């Protein structure tokens, strides 16, 4: 499926926590972890499970950078 977002990060789901409305998905991308918050419905429709190979798609308008 073609997307306009240019930042595609292939990885493996390390953790998923489904709440009533949202799901927190932790994806290992190389040495790093990327966390995504998606709707519970989307997580269920994609049948996401720990160990699944997925791609994190990042849009530049949705990324913030903070310096400790």
Model segments located where?
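Non-catalytic connector elements of ABC transporters
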Residues: 1-68
